[in-house]
Amino acid sequence: MKIRLENVNLNSNSGPNSFAQKIVREFQTLGHSFVNSGYDAALCFIEDHSNLSSKNLYQRLDGIYFNTDFNYDLQNSNILKTYQKAQGVIFQSKFSEELVTSFFGQHPNTTIIHNGANLDLIEKVQPIKNNVIDLYENVWSCAASWRPHKRLKENINYFLEHKGQNDCLMIAGKPDYFHKDPNIFYVGELNYEKLLSLYKRSKHFIHLGWLDNCPNVVVDARACGSQIICCSAGGTQEVAGADATVIEDSWDFKPTKLYNPPPLDFTKKIKNSYDSCYNMKKVTNKYLNFMTKNKF
């Protein structure tokens, strides 16, 4: 099949683009190609900037804007246009579906496909080793494009309240909050394989971000063997695994100040009812099945 990618930058490591890198690799392994014209299907990430035809247009939609600090209706306007003309819509989580339909209404042809991880690549990556990390018995980690709703402060507080005597926390990414502690290390921006190497060494991966749709870092950390710690508001718990620690959290699907998340009570832990598949090969086949049904 010939596929057109829309609104994708394969040189970027943002959430949607990092997923694009994964699915492109799997599509190509299966013998599919990527073209700009004469395509069988167009896979559009979030919104169409090229005025593509609605025929064979599939929108991969993780979420929409709802932050009352901005004009979210204006921010959503082109996403809504793409949603209305797309032949099919792929949501990243049940949360994403509920979010989008509560603002945009129902679409006649949708599916939910959670993000996946490249297990063949992960198998080749070795757990990270260095003179600092090797001093600790248990490694905890977290990684994100840090902004207030990602709750770095809460991630750190959770670690400080639950760590063992010989545990450390490795924080990847550019932090928006600092806490000085001998057991906490800020490692900066890491490339994808170094992140995987960190996850493979981590016993726990903390992601208490508020209202995330389907964070790739959680999928990758889980695939690397880390136990996930997350909150219940958003789609994170859907990809965190049955053994995840889930902190009770809430949201009413109404516009809100995204960068002012509510406080968490770490004692309010709930059992995770989700156990999604994270094998990228199976995820890719789900995309193909949805994009080709009734056509080939």
For each predicted feature, which ranges?
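Conserved donor-binding/catalytic core segment of Leloir-type glycosyltransferases
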Residues: 129-150, 156-161, 169-170
